[in-house]
Amino acid sequence: MNEHIIQMLPAENLYFLSGMYQWGIEVIKVIQKIENPVLTALVKFVTALGTEALYVPLILFIFWWIDEKRGLRFGILIIVSAWINSFMKDLLKQPRPFNLEPSLGMAFESSYGAPSGHAQMSLCFWIPMAAWLEKVWPRRRTVIWASSIFFVLLIAFTRLYLGVHFPTDLFAGWILGGIVLFILFVPGPSIEKFLASGGFRLQYISAAVITLAMNGIYTRDRSLPAIFLGFCLGYTLMTQRFPFLARAEINGKKPGGKVMFLRCLTGFAGLVFIYLVLRLVFPGEGSLFKETTVWGPASPFYELGRFIRYGLVGFWASAGAPRLFQRMGLASDPGESEK
């Protein structure tokens, strides 16, 4: 075990933590006895499904194609959950298994270990998903819940197999995810009614206040608060000025597969365009002007540019793309129907 890392642990917790870590290392060693190249490749693919690489496309697909309100709920839940996880990681500053036993590392993560973001995010996504799908297909309740729980456990297994999390990291992620669900998902309908009763002004103010609080509490990452603000403001503006209904009829017909494909194509193309173009223009390592002192990675405008970029990404998802769908005839346009 890496003695340098151990010496960094709080003295009063050293005995408990070192014992806990040693137990976790032994568990991982047992799991890694089944290691082989094919299984490792499969595990790395599955573990990638526990990240934004899966959640973002699924949430946007729900928002743009199935149910915009449901997409909003999933989006806010995942954004806030990810922010809380990042905050807790930096607060606890716990090592990963490969920090203590390098031979265990079959993948690399630059962030701290506990609580596991993969465990937390999978719980926060698949449990609400199961609750929703159960209402859509009540006769398939057992299959839906079994599949969701299986996927949560499968994601957790991949983190142990790759040596990037201790079992206790996973437990912490599940506990934190459960708390997030209890605070946001369970009272969700009541929160929505309260915000709706206060009108658009209350919704704008609430989004701004929550964003300020997120930035004030945790200053190391501005991207998640920015996405939250853009996503919420965009949704409020959309419902106020040009209501978008994902399943509304277009010229008397329900949107079909072609419309779905074109919405996803234009929506994701716009998302990538905004992200990449602003990354090239705004300060930072990816900027075209990074060689200049004022616009390089150490630029005083870096955080502001990053906030604007991610804010516009969130705004595009909930307002920009839906409005484009309407203008392209890919969604019903209330403005056109009034003419």
Can you describe what each PLM-predicted range is?
Residues 2-6, 68-70, 163, 167:
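Helix-coil boundary and interhelical linker segments in multi-pass alpha-helical membrane proteins
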Residues 35, 77, 219:
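Charged, low-complexity surface patches
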